[in-house]
Regions:
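A mid-sequence, solvent-exposed acidic-amphipathic segment
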Residues: 131-176
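Intrinsically disordered, low-complexity peptide-like regions
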Residues: 3, 14, 146-148, 153, ...
Length: 217
């Protein structure tokens, strides 16, 4: 019984796991491989999470791939398909669908995640930009969730194909069933690699901290 309760809690936390860092509308590009992995912790309590995804570009607008979420006594595998297009410098739109399956329960279907990605530049030099992610998660045994992540970011170019991008934003539910949460962090770009330091729940006793890395080849 205790294990079942822990797994249900893990499923609840996994709804937010894939949406911690900002996702942009564009896909990886034709014939390219994108990978991302992260570790999430809450200092002071035993609640570690990992999230990993690999995506392969099919043309300039589509990508397909897999992902894996692990939490306390929980593990979920997902297959994804993604679409994205650039409408203009100021507005881009994309989306993603991910059915996920419980690796600890005979690979049974667990939940379906659907995402809408919007982003664009605010200034002509492309340094200041905005980004929103909307996640609709339909669970097999729990009520659905509908969350929104809204960020402002500023890109600071450095030397030798490097840059630093701090971002700040808020997380809220379109169902208005939870308080608005602050989120933010930065990523450091080195050529085709990004190193992430992120977090949310800053005003709680155990904030969530994320360290991640991604690449494109």
């Amino acid at each position: 019984m205790r294990k079942a309760i822990v797994c249900c809690l893990g499923l609840l936390f996994s709804m937010q796991a894939i949406a911690q860092i900002p996702y942009y509308a564009g896909t990886v590009g034709d014939g390219k491989l994108y990978g991302y992995t992260s570790l999430k912790v809450r200092p002071g309590i035993n609640r570690q999470e990992t999230y990993t995804t690999f995506q392969y570009g099919l043309g300039d607008h589509f990508a397909t791939g897999i992902d894996l979420y692990t939490g306390q006594n929980c593990a979920y595998w997902g297959a994804l398909i993604r679409y994205g297009t650039k409408v203009s410098q100021w507005f881009n739109i994309g989306g993603e669908i991910i059915p996920s399956f419980d690796l600890n329960n005979s690979f049974k279907f667990a939940y379906l995640s659907s995402a809408l990605y919007l982003n664009g530049d605010i200034t002509r030099d492309k340094r200041l930009f905005w980004c929103t992610n909307t996640w609709w998660v339909v669970n097999k045994e729990k009520p659905f969730t509908l969350s929104n992540y809204e960020y402002l970011g500023y890109n600071i170019p450095l030397k030798k194909q490097q840059s630093l991008t701090p971002m700040v934003g808020v997380i809220h539910s379109w169902l208005f069933d939870q308080d608005i949460d602050l989120a933010g962090g930065f990523y450091y770009t080195i050529k085709n690699w990004n190193l992430y330091v992120w977090g949310n729940d800053f005003l709680k006793s155990h904030p969530r901290l994320i360290a991640g890395i991604d690449f494109t080849f």
